[in-house]
Design a protein with these regions (language model features):
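Transmembrane alpha-helical segments
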Residues: 1-5, 22, 39-50, 97-102, ...
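Transmembrane-embedded, aromatic-rich helix segments that form part
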Residues: 34-47, 63-65, 81-97, 240
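Alpha-helical transmembrane segments at the extracellular/periplasmic loop-to-helix junctions
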Residues: 88-103, 120-204, 215-216
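Transmembrane helix irregularities
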Residues: 22-34, 75-76, 228-232
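Membrane-interfacial entry segments at the cytosolic side of transmembrane helices
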Residues: 12-15, 54-64, 83-92, 108-123, ...
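Short hydrophobic alpha-helices at membrane interfaces in multi-pass membrane enzymes
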Residues: 5-25, 55-71, 217-221
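Hydrophobic/aromatic-rich transmembrane helices and adjacent perimembrane loops
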Residues: 220, 225, 230-251
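Hydrophobic core segments of alpha-helical transmembrane domains in multi-pass membrane transport
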Residues: 24, 45, 70, 124-132, ...
Length: 251
């Protein structure tokens, strides 16, 4: 997906988008934990209008990726239509709609105060979306967004606690401690810290680390979300490892 949106050849970009959506959907059918990648991708799409100017390209490649991914995901038994029409699909469809509306807003205003208008629009969507999710979480027959099982919701909101003794008794559902985190990632933390410094430092030319604005945005997003999600279950430390490896690769 990242390689596709950076490609200069539209035919190659099209093939990469299709193949990327197939690989992501296939991986999600094998392990439900791969639903994590929906979070950074959704946040990344939200930020694309602010870091990219080739709006005509974004208008077709992002909807194509999201549509193909959701279509293939719905064909599999897992995660299935419940994911497509539930919170997972909402996390991808909402940013895609936001991106399209932002591009049209930019054309209407001729680019004047685009960042300010876009941020206000984004804030309004976040507020409205929060109210919708909270209202949908109340058990009733009018629920229109399918919520996943508790362990997936717990990954989004680590402050939640389970009341099911069976869930708490599973070893891999234990909360990671500081000792375990340092045991798993002690080496990666050093290089990841250097990578963060290189990424954010103004004294170092970004050309030296070969990152443009959209790549830097994705690295920051996946770094934050990976560490955040891994704070819930010990088995989700794999996402902290992925985030730290990506950041450490910059060093």
């Amino acid at each position: 997906f990242l390689s596709a949106i950076k490609s200069q050849n539209k035919k190659i970009a099209f093939l990469k988008i299709i193949s990327g959506s197939i690989v992501l959907a296939s991986g999600m059918s094998a392990w439900g934990g791969n639903q994590f990648f929906v979070i950074p991708i959704g946040l990344f799409i939200l930020g694309l209008p602010f870091v990219r100017k080739d709006y005509n390209f974004l208008l077709w490649c992002i909807p194509l990726f999201v549509g193909t991914f959701l279509l293939i995901s719905g064909l599999f038994e897992r995660p299935g239509p419940a994911f497509v029409f539930g919170l997972g699909g909402l996390v991808l469809v909402t940013p895609t709609i936001f991106l399209i509306l932002c591009i049209f807003l930019n054309k209407i205003t001729h680019g004047k105060n685009f960042v300010r208008n876009g941020l206000v629009f984004l804030l309004s969507i976040i507020v409205i979306g929060s109210f919708v999710i909270i209202a949908n979480g109340i058990p009733s027959e009018s629920n229109f967004v399918y919520l996943p099982s508790f362990r997936y919701v717990n990954a989004l909101f680590p402050i939640l606690t389970s009341t099911d003794p069976l869930v708490d008794s599973v070893a891999e559902h234990a909360s990671p401690t500081t000792d375990i985190s340092f045991l798993f990632h002690s080496v990666w933390m050093i290089f990841a810290g250097i990578g963060i410094w290189l990424l954010l430092s103004k004294k170092i030319s970004q050309n030296k680390i070969f990152l443009n604005n959209d790549s830097r945005l994705f690295v920051i997003i996946i770094g934050i979300t990976g560490v955040y999600v891994s704070s819930v279950f010990i088995r989700l430390e794999v996402f902290a490892s992925i985030s730290l490896i990506i950041l450490a690769s910059l060093a």
